[in-house]
């Protein structure tokens, strides 16, 4: 799902004027050590890291309602591999609120995202993980909500278009 969203963001950015080079990378071996993210982020050396992933939809009986289907893209503030960059998270939340893009703040007690490797690569980069709530995660019948997927694509497109050198420096060094 993250790869599909990255491709759609690339399509949205095609022909648009912005100051950024956006790399959409489909990584491998995330579950066994973020290996693909380590090698690709070391090669790319990003100024800002954006991971597109999935998370558990907890909207089931007895679930903690951490992330629910149909309530927007998940903005990960913590997982076992990274505590998301507060300045970048605050910037993204501001973009979501201004553009009326639905979002949910979420966390993982176990497991991580490629953001965990990106934020430590080379000299480091402020990083954020956007996670799509999924019912029956890691199965052959996973279910996502189209509105959540659309929110993911919209916020990443908007984020890339909104960043310039001054904004990146402000986020990085605030």
Predicted features by range, described:
Residues 7, 38, 116-119:
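Short, hydrophobic alpha-helix immediately C-terminal to the catalytic nucleophile
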Residues 25-33, 55-56, 134-136:
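Acidic, glycine-rich active-site loops and adjacent beta-strand->loop/helix elements
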Residues 32-103:
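Metal-dependent peptidase/peptidase-like ectodomains
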Residues 3, 33-35, 114-115, 139:
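Short glycine/serine/threonine-rich phosphate/pyrophosphate-binding segments
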Residues 4, 21-23, 47-50, 102-104, ...:
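Structural motif
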Residues 1-31, 152-157:
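Alpha-helical metal-binding/catalytic segments enriched in His/Glu/Asp
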Residues 11-15, 42-44, 119-124:
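Alpha-helix C-terminal capping segments
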Residues 74-153, 158-174:
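Active-site-adjacent substrate-binding region
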